[in-house]
Amino acid sequence: MDFGALPPEINSGRMYAGPGSGPLLAAAAAWDALAAELYSAAASYGSTIEGLTVAPWMGPSSITMAAAVAPYVAWISVTAGQAEQAGAQAKIAAGVYETAFAATVPPPVIEANRALLMSLVATNIFGQNTPAIAATEAHYAEMWAQDAAAMYGYAGSSATASQLAPFSEPPQTTNPSATAAQSAVVAQAAGAAASSDITAQLSQLISLLPSTLQSLATTATATSASAGWDTVLQSITTILANLTGPYSIIGLGAIPGGWWLTFGQILGLAQNAPGVAALLGPKAAAGALSPLAPLRGGYIGDITPLGGGATGGIARAIYVGSLSVPQGWAEAAPVMRAVASVLPGTGAAPALAAEAPGALFGEMALSSLAGRALAGTAVRSGAGAARVAGGSVTEDVASTTTIIVIPAD
């Protein structure tokens, strides 16, 4: 740019309108901080590698790693120096600006010169202001030259200060194809291990089969033969598990079938409503109450809560022989007749009143009557036999009586 062709108003206005040297000083500080961090990283890398390769870790691997990381450490050191140089150049550029700014004519001075010239020209009626006008123009030319010189110097110094060494990219310290190669090696090793495992198990099975079959031919080795068969079966199970496991080819082939099963279960949800209704409905009697299941509805209605509470009474029981029973038993029992009323020709005394209750607990009454009847057949010494008459034992002549109780129809 030709700064000499520009008036001082433009050159001075540009210098005073800019942000000044503040951004350059901030950039210099940032470059210095980056340089310090890079120097610290390089020192840390160097000390770590040196500590590993000197004592605890020695051998081909340590030498290879140290050789691989050495270019990176060198790049960090070089980059740190470049960052430091960039910071110094930024400081130089800031100084150059301050020098050019100080050499530039302030815009107010230029404005005052132009205002004075206009005033002298306006009042120069008779030519009396001609020397003053010439002096003012000469002063303005000096300011023009001063600003042009300052701008030329500033441009040259800034060009020198802005010359920086280009930064380089960090060197490649690893093999780009190592990841793919490592994955291929791992897959190959896994496949080889699986195939060798199956081959070894097949070889073991083939070697055990003849000895196991031979041991079965003798009875003396039955126990060892069974143990051999257990080993053979276990080997077969292991082989089948390896061939059909979830990570085998056969197991991977079953993955599409899982989606089919899932859709089948979703479609089967519509058939669950009848099953749920049957599950939530009334349950049939089971266990000891299962014989009573047909009675429900035909003979026995639904169970309903009792209408009232429990009641009790005192001295209201009736007697069946010598047994106290509730009054309801007598109401539900059929009438039983004594053998004397049925067979009047016999000499047996009635063992039970004519209107004695029976039915539900008739067996109890009969057992009591039978016991009393048998008591009547016992022979008593000196006093004769005991005779049962009307439910009581009385003295009678010695005799033997058989009591037969026949319930009423």
From Swiss-Prot:
Role this protein plays: Virulence factor that modulates the production of host cytokines.
Lineage: superkingdom: Bacteria
Xref: SUPFAM superfamilies: PE/PPE dimer-like (SSF140459)
GO cellular component: cell surface
Record keyword Secreted present: yes
GO BP terms, alphabetized: response to host immune response
Protein family: Belongs to the mycobacterial PPE family.
Description of how the protein assembles with itself and partners: Interacts with host Toll-like receptor 2 (TLR2).
Compartment(s) where it occurs, according to its Swiss-Prot or TrEMBL record: Secreted, Cell wall; Cell surface
Record's keyword terms, sorted: Cell wall, Secreted, Virulence
Gene (name only): PPE32
Protein name (Swiss-Prot/TrEMBL): PPE family protein PPE32
Coarse class of the protein's main subcellular location: secreted
Protein species of origin: Mycobacterium tuberculosis (strain CDC 1551 / Oshkosh)
This protein's record includes keyword Magnesium: no
